[in-house]
Regions:
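Active-site microenvironment of metallo-dependent hydrolases
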Residues: 1-38, 42-44, 48, 59, ...
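Divalent metal-coordination and catalytic microenvironments
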Residues: 23, 40, 45, 70, ...
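Active-site glycine- and acidic-residue-rich loops that bind
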Residues: 139-142, 199-215, 294-297, 365-367
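Active-site gating loops and adjacent loop-to-helix segments of metal-dependent hydrolytic enzymes
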Residues: 88-121, 155-177, 235-262, 282-285, ...
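Alpha-helical scaffold segments that flank or form the walls of functional sites
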Residues: 72, 90-156, 179-192, 441-449
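Metal-coordinating catalytic core of metallo-dependent amide/deamination hydrolases
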Residues: 147-269
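His/Asp/Glu-enriched, well-ordered alpha-helical/loop segment
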Residues: 255-262, 304-390, 406-407
Length: 449
């Protein structure tokens, strides 16, 4: 008997821009998951699928296939606090207390040199360093955000830029009203940029008046913008606030309507139990900057207590002028080690929770959790590939632990932002080394003069 021919219709493969095939994928959502031999599918800058590699090869045909046989793929890292333009001041006045560092070194230097050119050049240098370190998004607080936006546009990184409020005149503006007006105008001009968002950025309780905070609170309510502010960075700041206002900085911010789930409190080192309760009450976010806190002698943030209170924590580097590095992987590792050591509990902040803080926790802190922070279908394709085939990372029993405790930024090989490859085989694709080297040397000579 003759068999009948099989007339089952063949399935037409789905076209995509990019298929990334690493050995391991840590999607962050769902929590604690490590996928082996899977593929991530990207089209038009969006994650469209995550599935086993064999199924991906049958279902999709991609313009580019990136095979990374000994790599782990994670969401791009998110730096929740920095001053990118200050990267040109890296190493100036090291080993000084924060107040001395600011008032006797940084602010005088800024008063002479801060400009659109300085901010653009410094931010481009910062973008280069962050991209090579696996950072795909940074949250900035500095002057001339329009100049920072030029560097963001050139480099291909994603950024949340600060609309500064500061009750001191500078080359950028005559005072807080001028800063806010200029910052809002920049935001309006760039509102359609696919990789830019904005936050209101009153500098700190000790540099911003009650009247300015009232304006910031009103603007936040009107625009829906988040608020990015230094808070409780040192005990000196708390003591000065008690002397001047009769209340702790967070108490004052609550009175002025600044605290809320849209508020990102940077550093949050000098906290007592009542402060943490107050932050939890208002669902305040925290940008934890452990290296800067240690280097400037500010102290060690109570991250264990913050975490226990349900407060979301993202990781930040602060500026390279105070930290000297924009290295989020080392920052994240230190955050975990400080918690374990100070609490004498090795079980605190396991590797997956630290990766969360450096990715989705950061996205939540910036109000961008629906767009970035995890390798989830429908989110933007911001990705970081880390090679684990080096003598310093072998053998690999747990890729998540290896990222935190063995790997470093030197193991980052590929980075994508919005589906575009901005670091390929450890080389920047949008920024030339010669350009940033020349700009950095020019500013070094100016500052020395």
């Amino acid at each position: 008997m003759q068999s009948m021919p099989n007339h089952a219709p063949s399935i037409t493969p789905i076209k995509a821009d990019l298929m990334v095939c690493p050995r391991w994928i840590i999607p962050v959502e769902p929590a604690g998951v490590v996928l082996e031999d899977h593929a991530l599918i990207i089209n038009s800058g969006e994650i469209v699928d995550l599935l086993p590699r064999e199924a991906a090869a049958q279902r999709y045909v991609a313009d580019t296939i990136e095979t990374l046989p000994e790599h782990v793929l994670i969401p791009g890292l998110i730096n929740t606090h920095t001053h990118a333009g200050m990267t040109l001041m890296r190493g100036i006045a090291d080993d000084q207390p924060l107040k001395t560092w600011l008032e006797e070194w940084i602010w005088p230097l800024e008063s002479r040199w801060v400009s659109t050119e300085m901010v653009r050049d410094g931010t481009l240098l910062a973008c280069a360093e962050m991209l090579l370190s696996g950072v795909t998004t940074f949250n900035d607080m500095y002057f001339f955000p329009e100049a920072a936006a030029e560097a963001v546009d050139q480099s291909g990184i994603r950024a949340s830029l600060g609309i500064l409020a500061f009750d001191v005149p500078t080359a950028y503006g005559h005072g807080a009203d001028d800063y806010l007006t200029r910052g809002l105008a920049t935001r309006d001009a760039l509102r359609n940029h696919p990789r830019l968002s904005f936050m209101l950025a009153p500098h700190a309780p000790y540099t911003v008046s009650d009247a300015t905070f009232d304006k910031v609170a009103t603007l936040a309510a009107q625009t829906g913008l988040g608020i990015h502010i230094h808070a409780h960075e040192t005990q000196h700041e708390v003591d000065d606030s008690l002397h001047q206002y009769g209340e702790r900085p967070l108490e004052r911010l609550e009175r002025l309507g600044i605290l809320g789930p849209q508020t990102l409190a940077v550093h949050a080192v000098a906290l007592n139990d009542a402060d943490i309760t107050l932050m939890a009450k208002h669902n305040v976010q925290v940008a934890h900057c452990p290296v800067a806190n240690l280097k400037l002698g500010s102290g060690i943030a109570r991250t264990t207590a913050l975490n226990a209170a349900g407060i979301n924590i993202g990781i930040g580097t602060d500026g390279a002028a105070g930290n000297n590095r924009l290295d989020l992987l080392s920052e994240t590792r230190l955050a975990g080690l400080l918690a374990k050591g100070t609490q004498q509990d090795p079980g605190l902040f396991p590797a997956h929770s630290l990766i969360y803080m450096a990715t989705l926790g950061g996205a939540r802190a910036l109000g961008l959790q629906d767009q970035i922070g995890s390798l989830t279908i429908g989110k933007r394709a911001d990705l970081c590939a880390i090679a684990l085939d080096n003598a310093t990372t072998l053998p690999v029993f747990d890729p998540a632990s290896q990222i935190i405790h063995a790997a470093g930024r030197e193991h980052v090989t590929h980075v994508w932002v919005d589906g575009q490859c901005v670091v390929k085989k450890k080389h920047l694709t949008e920024i030339s080394h010669g350009e940033i080297y020349a700009k950095a040397k020019t500013w070094e000579n100016r500052f020395r003069g």
